[in-house]
From Swiss-Prot:
It is a multi-pass membrane protein. The gene is cbrB. It is found in: Cell inner membrane. NCBIfam families: PRK09823.1 (NF007334). It comes from the Bacteria. Keywords: Cell inner membrane, Cell membrane, Membrane, Transmembrane, Transmembrane helix. Belongs to the CbrB family. The keyword Cell division does not apply. One of its GO terms (cellular component) is plasma membrane. Residues 1-11, 58-83, 147-157 are cytoplasmic. The keyword tRNA-binding does not apply. This is Inner membrane protein CbrB. Residues 33-36, 105-125 are periplasmic.
């Protein structure tokens, strides 16, 4: 598979599935770590919750997918290292993206955006980004569109 096709494949899958996986882990975290009654409130506003996760998480997830696609063969072919890089990259890219958004006042003008992007809710951003990066890095080679018969042996140079 060519590098450009792998970048598009990984970027799109990460952007579409990454925020949804992050929401799943965040809901589980809230259910087990906080009060289970808060989960009832989240279920009532789940469409808005999903929309907010996609608007704040799709671009960092896509950039994480591009980063995972551009890994050298020695790192990208080993699941353990690919998951490690995907998780760390997801957290770092998400935090950089949120810092940029906070400094752009027009995009962060609503109280809901400011609440999500504030430093007080760091766990709400880190846990979904870390786990979505790890899970997506693990399953990306099994998703449709990747030519399994042709191993990824092309170099990036």
């Amino acid at each position: 598979m060519s590098v450009s096709r792998r970048v598009i494949h990984h970027g799109l899958y990460f952007a579409v599935l990454g925020p949804l996986i992050g929401v799943l882990f965040l809901v589980l975290y809230i259910f087990f770590a906080k009060e289970p009654l808060i989960l009832l409130v989240i279920i009532q506003v789940l469409p808005l919750f999903l929309l907010m996760s996609i608007t704040t998480g799709a671009i960092p997830a896509m950039l994480t997918g591009v980063m995972v696609a551009c890994l050298p063969e020695k790192i990208g072919s080993q699941k353990r290292y690919r998951c490690l890089v995907g998780g760390i990259g997801g957290v770092v890219i998400t935090e950089i993206y949120c810092a940029v958004i906070v400094h752009i006042k027009d995009m962060a003008s609503s109280a809901l955006f400011e609440n999500i992007l504030s430093g007080e809710n760091l766990v709400v951003r880190i846990i979904p980004a870390l786990l979505a990066g790890v899970v997506m890095s693990r399953i990306i080679t099994h998703l449709p569109g990747l030519d399994i018969s042709c191993p990824e042996t092309d170099s990036l140079s």
